[in-house]
């Protein structure tokens, strides 16, 4: 597996992977419109989006972020791992890639919106293992500058 900056040639495979991951969680797989134009919704704003690629050049995971205006914080988006490859460190590697990048550009905190605990139980288990704490209902946050000590 390798983690790379998103490239347009992977768009359809990324969308398919995310829809498949949502379906596996028992959710009606809807398309998030930001995924239709990663360039405009992430890169053109100065933000980033990464994908995990397997040995067959297929998308097996993703994560991106958008900066919160007038702050040094970001909101993480679209951290997904292909359903049959969960619990193999792919999500952790994607999150670490994003956090290391954020620290390198001076961001202070990452925020994630999780939704309710009943429907998003995997996320509610994953993020606390990586230092995220709930600070508002359905939101978790990690102070990035503290995490590198």
Per-segment meaning from a language model:
Residues 1-2:
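Extreme N-terminal starter segment of soluble prokaryotic enzymes
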Residues 92, 108, 116-136:
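Conserved active-site alpha-helix within GNAT-family acetyltransferase domains
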Residues 68-70, 81-84, 117-119, 147:
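Short coil/turn motifs at secondary-structure junctions
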Residues 64, 88, 126-129, 145-149:
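Accessory recognition modules or surfaces
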Residues 95, 102-115:
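Conserved GNAT acetyl-CoA-binding A-motif
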Residues 5-77, 82, 95, 101, ...:
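Acetyl-CoA-dependent GNAT
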Residues 81, 87-100, 125, 129:
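Conserved acetyl-CoA-binding loop-helix of GNAT-fold acetyltransferases
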Residues 86, 111-123, 141, 145:
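Conserved beta-strand-loop-alpha-helix junction that forms the acyl-donor binding cleft
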């Amino acid at each position: 597996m390798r983690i790379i900056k998103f490239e347009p040639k992977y768009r359809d495979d990324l969308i398919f992977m995310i829809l498949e991951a949502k379906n596996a969680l028992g959710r009606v797989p809807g398309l998030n419109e930001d995924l239709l134009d990663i360039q405009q919704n992430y890169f053109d704003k100065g933000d980033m989006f990464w994908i995990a690629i397997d040995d067959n050049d297929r998308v097996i995971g993703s994560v991106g972020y958008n900066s919160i205006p007038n702050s040094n914080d970001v909101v993480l988006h679209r951290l997904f791992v292909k359903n049959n490859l969960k619990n193999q460190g792919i999500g952790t590697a994607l999150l670490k890639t994003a956090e290391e990048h954020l620290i390198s550009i001076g961001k202070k905190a990452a925020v994630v919106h999780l939704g309710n605990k009943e429907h998003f139980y995997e996320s509610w288990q994953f993020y606390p293992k990586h230092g995220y704490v709930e600070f508002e209902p359905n939101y978790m946050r990690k102070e990035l500058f503290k995490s590198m000590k």
